[in-house]
């Protein structure tokens, strides 16, 4: 078996309609041909994108990219787990409640949480403190905002509905989130 991962799939499989210069059409055509030819082999193709609206619909037909997963931002428990990993080894003051930070970071991505932890560390350094306090995190929360806004969340929901209507529902293995 072989797993082929295409990160930023939208740059390789851009919709012919949205590719004004048609530069990617040759790449897209070749990818589609190769994916058709490998249908019976042990090759799994994974495409990753944060711009699903740019991917050509032909990539979403049976035998190509059969399963579409929309990865939601981390929930509160996941944010807590991420924060614990990010702060492991950081000199945290005794007054820090990581649960409170997880609660107050709704719509933060893992990258947003990493920025928050770095910001809290910088705040502690600016105070010449050896420990990162809850106030350092509170200041960080004012500076580091979540990258997923209501508008972005709605946009992804709309795209999810659009993409879900393209993929044939006949395959029992196809699922959506």
Specify the residue positions occupied by each region the protein language model found.
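C-terminal engagement/docking regions of AAA+ P-loop ATPases
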Residues: 97-117, 125-177
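Walker A/P-loop NTP-binding motif of AAA+ ATPase domains
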Residues: 1-108, 120
